[in-house]
């Protein structure tokens, strides 16, 4: 038997085991721990508690026109933030058979990607503007789990609660607003085939970029701190962001920022506690600088004035790359000197490649 056939047999066998596990769970209450994720089991439990049968014929239905109009109007801000990334993602999925959709916090599709020739009929029905993909409407699905758990999810074939959805695979990720609430959900789905790539990772990446664009549109009266380990991430959709009130309280931090800082996304602490620099000092800076955080990480950091003008100011700051590069190289050379010229040790200390050290040395020598 060919390796391709072996792979198909493995996939089919895994899905068959999940299907049987779901039936045993519904009929006998046996929890298939280890075979499917806990979030999926919990979704099955909720569907079962609503009195739903796995053999119901559940098809996507459209919201009434007046309800859809209200949903689209309410979601205009997130659509504006998402539109550039939705175009990019739609183009990337052209030859995959996948369809993508942007959902509002209630699970209603507010934007659907192009219907590519390889896309299946059922998945095209799922990803139509106005379709309700919430758990109450469609049972277990990636968007439904995102709404319940707040985290990214992937649901494959027999993991869906309703048997009629077993040909679908879907992956979804949340998009949060500046209060940490759910602003929207990004979903991609495919029918009667495997994704062929890490769908969950891709949807998380695009959702994070959309979230950053949305966060930059925060209400007036806040300052925006942007930071990252890498210089070229400043001004991108993948930088750490923090929203700061005029009194210096940090009221929200995006996911990247929270991971860099080692804090929660809603710390409600002052800037100095979180970043190790006084707010009055930071807000006087009009350029991107290198700064060492309280946890020891050295990051590039910038603060904008009125968030309404944040992206323009950030672009202006980032355009002064020469001064930032000088600081970057100086930090590398100081660390190299402190390690007696040991390049490998300095690279480990800074968390950079040895090539970065060599480039900094070459830049210094050419001046």
Q: What are these language model-derived features?
A:
Residues 261-271:
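PAS and related sensory helical modules
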Residues 322-367:
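Bacterial C-terminal helix-turn-helix
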Residues 110-111, 261, 350:
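PAS-family sensory domains
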Residues 1-137, 141-157, 167, 176-247, ...:
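Intrinsically disordered, low-complexity terminal regulatory regions
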Residues 162:
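An active-site-proximal beta-strand-loop segment
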